[in-house]
Structures are given as structure tokens and as C-alpha cells.
């Protein structure tokens, strides 16, 4: 069962387009409210699974104290509408299956769903409406889906069709960020673990066979032994969003940087102090000029940590901020300005 947030007002934990999954065995994947509403959603999801209906909408309003359940003590001051959509073997697990395939192949994709009937379509950069349920609103859904594919994001809107006025929810799927770790030493393990927890696709490479042990890393990570000179042949660097060079070997790090300098990887992190960065830059010569605008060294945010886990957190946090076009500033400063001391 898929649960999509299709609309919000006021303050909510997540916004329109967020997705959570429920299984017939009462397993949950993801969060929509931070834990406040998931139990009720699960109850309704299981009822829907046992019924002949394809979808249902639940609304949760915590904006006032009149509501005896959702308005008592939550303090969120927001309204959330959630579309529950039956996704099972009978539907081929659509539309999620097509969105997942597109994400894995790094194609842009979107889906449009009729909120009342559960009819849907999926469009990708390679096709329009390839995965679609039968229904009288197919043409309207394809139009909305194509628009969402072009614009991105998520939206719910009313649309006039040949069969009346319909509420259509549409959302564009985003591919998982891809992270390349050049160096599979012990300190790469927490970096891979944090990134995997965020849902990133992680590849770890090393030129030393003794370090190439997939058992040390999360199950879905790729761990590959490489000849640094042919790294670009082993790994499709065009599909890498961020790379971190962390082999702890000066010559090897320089060779990794030389390969990445020829690539278009937008974020290249380098572990180690500034003096080491400058020495490597000098050895790179003219290649350093192309790398400089993309080089984050020393890698990571200044969080004050010294343990491998704290350093890994600072690295992944900086990459997360970079991928979202943020600077990694505190929310208190972003939303309220600097706080004056009392």
C-alpha cells in the first residue's frame, strides 16, 4: 500500500509528494508525520488492502484544539491529506515499479493519479503513458503527467475532463544520489553507512585488494577493486553526483584526483588537511585548475567531531547540503536570523 501526501496547509512534518509504504504484514517503510499519524494510516491501509477499493483519502487536521484526537497536544498547527493507493501483484506494483525502474536508470519520471478512482499513468523521458491503468481519464492523466515530468515537484489540482471535474495528484520521481568513495579503509565504513541510510547509491573503490571486502559495508553498496588509471572505465562517472577521495595514500589520492579532474563530477571531497590539499594540487599541475571549483577540501562541515563516525557525519552532511543547494546553516539562523544573547 502506498501513502502519498497530496496536500498540506500550515506546518507539517513532510510536504506534498512524500511517500510511505505499508505491507500486508503491517511493516512500515518511511514516515509522513514523524510518528503521530502512522498508526491510524496503517489501520486504514490494511482495511483498504482487504477491500475491493483501489484508493482512499485520509485528512488530518491539527490546527485547533477542537479535534479530540488530532488536535490534542500535537502542536503541529497543520493540515495533511493523504492518498492511500493499493499497490500489489494484481497491479504489477504500479505505478511504483515503473518509477523505481526509472530511478535506477537515472531517467526522469512522473506519475499522475486520479484521487477518486485510483487511475494512474506514468511517464518517463523515454515514454509517455507506458504504465497506465485502464480508465476514462487516461488522456487527462497523461497531460498532467507530462507537465509534472517537465516541471518536477508534486502538485494536486482539479482538472476539467470530458467526464467531469477530477482531482489529479501528480509527482515527479527523483533518482537516488550517487556517491563514490575512493578508498575502502575503516573510516569509509561509517560514511557508507550514513549515505546508505539516506537512500543513496554508494560505490566504494580501492586499488588494494586487501581492502576490497563487501562484508564490511551495507548490503546495497557496491565494493570494487580498481586500477586507478582505468577508474573511468569501471565506473560511469557521468552518473556520479559526489565523490570523496580518502585512501590515506598520498600518491593514490593524487591519481584518484587526476581521474576525477577529467570528469564532470560536481562535488569532489578530499580527506586531509589544507597543506595536503595544496601539495596534491601542485602535483596535479594544470589539471588542478579544472578541479578547484569542484573540490571540497578539507571535506566536511565543521561540526567539531574527532571520531570516525563524527567525521563521516560531517562529510555526508556537507554532501547533503551541496546536493540540495544549501550551505548547511542552522535552521534557527535560516528562519529567525541570528539570536541575540539573553
Where are the predicted features?
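Conserved SAM/SAH-binding loop
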Residues: 226-231, 251
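Segments forming oxygen-rich coordination pockets for charged ligands
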Residues: 1-207, 211, 215-220, 224, ...
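Short beta->alpha junction loops/turns
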Residues: 34, 184, 249-250, 273, ...
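A generic structural signal for alpha->beta connector loops
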Residues: 199, 220, 264-265, 291-292
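Adenosine-phosphate binding glycine-rich loop
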Residues: 266, 270-342
